[in-house]
Amino acid sequence: MRHKIKGRKLNVTSSHRKAMLANMAVSLVTHEQIKTTLPKAKELRPYIEVLVTKAKDNNLAARRNILSKIKDKKAIEKLIDVLGVRYKDRPGGYTRIVKAGFRYGDLAPIAYIEFVDRDINAKGNIPQDNSKEDIKSNKGTK
């Protein structure tokens, strides 16, 4: 029986799982939305919620505690300066998981995990203000 056993193994070693959660947390902080499997998203949610709650304090001890979990300095800066300020009045529930069907190769359940009230432009793939005429005129030139 699995009584009092917290977390999912995700079929990887503990060091791999720790590194994977840290990398996924950096990606989620950077892009504010990522696509992954449903069990990984469910495992990432409490991991990132704790980091955002610590980022709301914005003191040296909280910064060092976050640094022990994730190693990317730019992600830590965004976590404290942007997300900590954005969710200052929210007592929890900073992320949502949206199911997105099944993966083609192995039918693994896929989900998006994203921040609530996220910045739409943070994803980085928003098209520019190029009109169709500009694209057609630049097509022949190199």
From Swiss-Prot:
Residues making up the signal peptide according to the UniProt record: none
Subunit structure: Part of the 50S ribosomal subunit. Contacts protein L32.
InterPro entries membership: Ribosomal_bL17, Ribosomal_bL17_CS, Ribosomal_bL17_sf
Signal keyword on record: no
Lineage, opening ranks: Bacteria, Pseudomonadati, Pseudomonadota, Alphaproteobacteria, Rickettsiales
Xref: PROSITE patterns: RIBOSOMAL_L17
GO CC field: cytosolic large ribosomal subunit
Pfam family, one: Ribosomal_L17
Native source organism of the sequence: Rickettsia bellii (strain OSU 85-389)
Cross-referenced NCBIfam families: L17
Similarity annotation: Belongs to the bacterial ribosomal protein bL17 family.
GO biological process: translation
Key words of the record: Ribonucleoprotein, Ribosomal protein
Keyword Ribonucleoprotein among UniProt keywords: yes
Gene transcribed to yield this protein: rplQ
PANTHER family (alphabetical): LARGE RIBOSOMAL SUBUNIT PROTEIN BL17M, RIBOSOMAL PROTEIN L17
One MF term in the entry's GO annotations: structural constituent of ribosome
Name the record gives this protein: Large ribosomal subunit protein bL17
